[in-house]
Amino acid sequence: MKWCKRGYVLAAILALASATIQAADVTITVNGKVVAKPCTVSTTNATVDLGDLYSFSLMSAGAASAWHDVALELTNCPVGTSRVTASFSGAADSTGYYKNQGTAQNIQLELQDDSGNTLNTGATKTVQVDDSSQSAHFPLQVRALTVNGGATQGTIQAVISITYTYS
């Protein structure tokens, strides 16, 4: 009888041991990033008034309004943040420029940096952070244009969104 009980105990121990042998492996994956702390965005919203434009001056293909300046300012950039990249997005029309979402037809909006580079949707612009003031400055300009000519009377409106990344 003792042998029989020992056999059951031994069988139970082996059963438990084999259960632990068949346990599944567990993997813990840890992800993260070390990033630069963001600057304070001083220019949270900017409005550019193009004023009244005359349809007769926007009849021919390539005609455009005067440039209007707009500046994006970032301040309080932490030490260690050396560059700020702005990514531009907005509704584009078939010409690639920003689409006029107002009522005037055959009008597009063009955004450029101070070097004359066009910043259509999807474009990026990187500037250095000024070490002495811990700030970054994006001087930009915008205008209305008609790629194909034949602008009609109506309103002009576009929304351009900017997302910043820091390094």
Curated annotation (Swiss-Prot):
Designated name of the protein: Protein FimG
Keyword Disulfide bond belongs to the record: yes
Primary subcellular site in the record, as a coarse category: other
GO cellular component, one term: pilus tip
Source species of the chain: Escherichia coli (strain K12)
Location in the cell: Fimbrium
Site entry: Required for stability and transport: 166
One BP term from GO: mechanosensory behavior
Family recorded in the similarity comment: Belongs to the fimbrial protein family.
Keywords from the named record: Disulfide bond, Fimbrium, Signal
Disulfide bonds: 39-77
Signal sequence region: 1-23
Stated role: Involved in regulation of length and mediation of adhesion of type 1 fimbriae (but not necessary for the production of fimbriae). Involved in the integration of FimH in the fimbriae.
